[in-house]
């Protein structure tokens, strides 16, 4: 009975089956819990939120994230207090978009975006470095109150 109803709606033109992809996108139809490509964000002052704690690297099931930490130079007020990533790379081919990296990040530096169309001509293009990840992520304003929001 359900199959006949669907067929009738399709034949009468009530059900739209095909989406003309480059012109039409699914952005408005994505659910709020959709997990797309991971990206890094900066704060409103342009400072990197990532402190190279490497929790996201350790929790990533397919080992798609690699981080090389470095010390912050002595000329800033954050010297010897925090680290920052010298290199931060995510292999988008290996990433399974599980969201564990976003959940474990204590500084809210990595987010899964709504972007679902990631392409490249080679495997090397699919390894996003720190600059590409910050370009995708942009700026995230506000205090880090991740654990207070869940109460």
Where are these regions (language model features)?
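Non-ligating segments of multi-cofactor redox enzymes
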Residues: 1-83, 87-94, 103, 107-151
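Basic, alpha-helical nucleic-acid-binding regions used in initiation and control of genome expression
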Residues: 98
